[in-house]
Amino acid sequence: MDGWRRMPRWGLLLLLWGSCTFGLPTDTTTFKRIFLKRMPSIRESLKERGVDMARLGPEWSQPMKRLALGNTTSSVILTNYMDTQYYGEIGIGTPPQTFKVVFDTGSSNVWVPSSKCSRLYTACVYHKLFDASDSSSYKHNGTELTLRYSTGTVSGFLSQDIITVGGITVTQMFGEVTEMPALPFMLAEFDGVVGMGFIEQAIGRVTPIFDNILSQGVLKEDVFSFYYNRDSENAQSLGGQIVLGGSDPQHYEGNFHYINLIKTGVWQIQMKGVSVGSSTLLCEDGCLALVDTGASYISGSTSSIEKLMEALGAKKRLFDYVVKCNEGPTLPDISFHLGGKEYTLTSADYVFQESYSSKKLCTLAIHAMDIPPPTGPTWALGATFIRKFYTEFDRRNNRIGFALAR
């Protein structure tokens, strides 16, 4: 394993286990730090249980969903969380009911399972359920909410209550899910989702939670940032953190390099090329890239990823690309050209060994994903990229900043 990492069986999902401030300033503005832990993804759980992914059908490899509110369907295509590796914790209601959630820059709505979900839905049995009758601050709304995933439909209705995140409380409209398919959600370590995107992506134009936090004026800056610990060997180590209102200099070095968003409303930037070794192989004429905290891997169009995998000598196995483990350390660097700077991943960053596999094959943390217009075609830079580069999402200036993580 010289020079690269082994992916442990518990994977890289994160469980938020606490929050604190970086200090206690005398004024009312500050920024909050949320600590995170690791847990397994849905796909990892399926593989560990010996599930034949090929028999589940091709829809399980398509990391997309379509959101709808009432009779209106959004054109936003987002991750289906099959490979999501990071999640945290929020409280809903008075007193707070605690939920494990994915913090997703690719979506803008908040949803958790509801106590009104029938126990005929096995996935609801295995998750924490929000009980409105236990909250003194709950307000009924009732507007129908539907999330159509490639692997099944999640539906419910909108409600309003107080949500606590990172020590901040906000009054927030959120979805109470009453119907959710057993697969994949029965195996999900997370209960729901907190969208960190823009109101333009929000179904029903529901104000996103970060917008509501900003309206209170409690943060030092109109930004939030993500750090994912690259130490995959120690399950008890700090898994990472989300900072609301700033960035943590303990976890990056040097200065941030900023790239403006393509347009307001989506965390998407311009990319000027993808290099393998010293040769620019893809995106020579420019392309788009989402920065997606709800995704584990780096993804691109099928045609682009096939060309990239051919250059790396990787073979397709079901929905993954693999190489012989002894070849992993010899694979070339992959560089992403963003804002006039190259962001380089070594094989140690994008190759991992599945500890539940008896074969000496290692998986590449790069997948094919075809996203249609208007968002796509686009690349998506998920946890594989964010682990290497501390990422700041700047709402005030509509830009994303990267700095080398440490």
Curated annotation (Swiss-Prot):
Chain positions listed as propeptide in the UniProt record: 24-66
CDD domains xref list: renin_like
A GO term for molecular function: aspartic-type endopeptidase activity
GO CC field: extracellular space; membrane
Annotated localization: Secreted; Membrane
Main location class: secreted
E.C. code: 3.4.23.15
Peptidase A1 domain location: 86-403
Stored Pfam families: A1_Propeptide, Asp
Keyword Disulfide bond included in the entry's annotation: yes
Glycosylation sites: N71, N141
GO terms of biological process kind: angiotensin maturation
Signal peptide: 1-23
Active-site residues, Swiss-Prot/TrEMBL: D104, D292
Keywords: Aspartyl protease, Cleavage on pair of basic residues, Disulfide bond, Glycoprotein, Hydrolase, Membrane, Protease, Secreted, Signal, Zymogen
Cysteine pairings via disulfide bonds: C117-C124, C283-C287, C325-C362
Activity regulation note: Interaction with ATP6AP2 results in a 5-fold increased efficiency in angiotensinogen processing.
Reaction(s) catalysed by this chain's protein: Cleavage of Leu-|-Xaa bond in angiotensinogen to generate angiotensin I
Family membership: Belongs to the peptidase A1 family.
Quaternary context: Interacts with ATP6AP2.
Protein role: Renin is a highly specific endopeptidase, whose only known function is to generate angiotensin I from angiotensinogen in the plasma, initiating a cascade of reactions that produce an elevation of blood pressure and increased sodium retention by the kidney.
Protein name: Renin
Annotated organism of origin: Macaca fascicularis
Protein encoded by which gene: REN
